[in-house]
């Protein structure tokens, strides 16, 4: 684990947290607020007490994605294509199934789950491209 790994892990963690804020805190805020009264979702005030868990989760996401991506770099292929491939693979293996599982065990509206899957897949593709840009296959850092 070199310096690039640590820098990349931190940057991807921050990017993941920011993308999730855009997706869940801004774009889906209205959908979530409609579920607060039923007790399915926490109110924004209650959710703020759990921010340390969100930070910890995004650190795990950032460093986990960095570790996996760096193990599978193919130096013979364009970086952005590799990043998109990686982001798509993670979305198919973890992001989309995670929301399908939540839908099966929680009474969430189907429209919300579709939005979550689409927006989170786009976020994962962006994280894949960021990983590709930060890890161009050379040892500059």
Indicate residue ranges for each PLM-predicted region.
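Juxtamembrane/disordered regions of integral membrane proteins
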Residues: 1-141
